[in-house]
């Protein structure tokens, strides 16, 4: 029975699934908006929310520890960690949570999978228009 299980398996081993979530999180942090399936977006949301919360809390209190922790969770991508600590942590300093939103966006042409746009809340419209495919 599946009591208390909160994540999907995506027919992947655990390491592959965690790597996929880390890659999606890095893409979301870099571009601030990605297009992916609804199931992946729903699994990605708590992962990214935790990363932003850790970055927000440790940006001032213990930046070295925060940077190392985020590097381990995000696959060692230093540019994304720097953006998270320098830009996003300051943007959401007063926000207690709910940093992302999921917008349903129809179905994919090849396999009719439900597609969603995942983006950060309070994102300026003048910021990057490019949408990363995930």
Swiss-Prot record:
A Pfam family per the record: Ribosomal_L17
GO BP of this protein: translation
Molecular function (Gene Ontology), one example: structural constituent of ribosome
PROSITE patterns, alphabetized: RIBOSOMAL_L17 (PS01167)
Keyword annotations: Ribonucleoprotein, Ribosomal protein
Database matches in InterPro entries: Ribosomal_bL17, Ribosomal_bL17_CS, Ribosomal_bL17_sf
Protein origin, superkingdom: Bacteria
GO cellular component, one term: cytosolic large ribosomal subunit
Oligomeric form and interacting partners: Part of the 50S ribosomal subunit. Contacts protein L32.
UniProt family annotation: Belongs to the bacterial ribosomal protein bL17 family.
Protein name: Large ribosomal subunit protein bL17
Species this protein is from: Anaplasma marginale (strain Florida)
Gene from which the chain derives: rplQ
